[in-house]
């Protein structure tokens, strides 16, 4: 696969792109930010891997600029950020609960994962830029926890494993596909199995205290007619 440096960020960090064909189908370019390594033995002797700063991340503005420059080839980015595992407990019935894994995602991530919406809406760019406390939950979680009630517009409170409590408003329900999330543990009762709850990725950064404005790892999504090699040569 080809690798190309698209920009120099800060003084010691460079962004590289590796052209790949994603296993889920469709053209993607997997991107990551890493330090520029020393070129000589003398430099290696005193070199220390630098810490990331806000200026080192690939910003949303950079991504938007790339999409604007190549609208026929680039459709967006898919990125995720693990916020934590936790539990939602019905305040009126402690026996009614749901275990979730909170993932911060970009608006394009559900399409990237080939997940279809069941009800409501997906997360939007406005949700992301506004760092809104909204979420999209799995249909199987919605059916069990809300017991037939419409979950759209409902507020849920998640207590994470480290004791943090996060409140979100449900704006959408996606169709859960176990094949896309890996094997299940048959020893765990179905009621206790965790499902992924998606929130805006910028919201997840803020809740973690980092409040970073950019991305360290992401998948650049290319249109069906785009050529991967040509895209990485821009």
Per-segment meaning from a language model:
Residues 1-38:
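Alpha-helical transmembrane segments
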Residues 10, 66, 78-80, 194, ...:
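Membrane-interface segments of envelope glycosyltransferases acting on lipid-linked substrates or membrane lipids
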Residues 32, 47, 51-123:
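Short amphipathic beta-strand/extended segments in non-transmembrane regions
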Residues 34, 80-83, 161, 173:
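Short, well-ordered beta-to-alpha junction loops that form the rim of enzyme active sites
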Residues 35-39, 46-57, 91-96, 173-178, ...:
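Structural beta->alpha junctions
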Residues 44-45, 212:
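Extended serine/threonine-enriched, polar tracts that run as long, contiguous segments within proteins
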Residues 108-122, 133-234:
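Mid-to-C-terminal secondary-structure elements
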């Amino acid at each position: 696969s080809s690798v190309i440096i698209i920009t120099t960020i800060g003084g010691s960090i460079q962004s590289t792109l590796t052209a790949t064909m994603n296993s889920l189908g469709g053209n993607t370019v997997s991107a990551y930010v890493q330090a520029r390594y020393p070129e000589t033995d003398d430099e290696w002797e005193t070199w220390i891997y630098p810490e990331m700063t806000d200026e080192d991340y690939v910003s949303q503005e950079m991504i938007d600029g790339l999409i604007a420059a190549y609208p026929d080839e680039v459709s967006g980015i898919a990125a995720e950020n693990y916020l934590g595992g936790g539990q939602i407990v019905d305040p009126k019935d402690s026996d009614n609960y749901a275990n979730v894994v909170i993932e911060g995602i970009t608006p394009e991530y559900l399409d990237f994962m080939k997940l279809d919406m069941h009800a409501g809406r997906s997360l939007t760019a406005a949700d992301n830029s506004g760092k809104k406390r909204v979420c999209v939950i799995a249909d199987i979680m919605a059916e069990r926890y809300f017991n037939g009630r419409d979950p759209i517009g409902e507020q849920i409170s998640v207590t994470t494993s480290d004791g943090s409590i996060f409140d979100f408003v449900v704006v959408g329900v996606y169709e859960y596909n176990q094949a896309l999330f890996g094997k299940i543990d048959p020893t765990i009762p179905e009621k206790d199995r965790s499902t992924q709850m998606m929130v805006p990725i910028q919201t997840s950064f803020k809740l973690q205290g980092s409040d970073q404005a950019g991305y360290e790892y992401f998948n650049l999504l290319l249109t069906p007619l785009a050529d991967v090699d040509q895209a990485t040569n821009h």
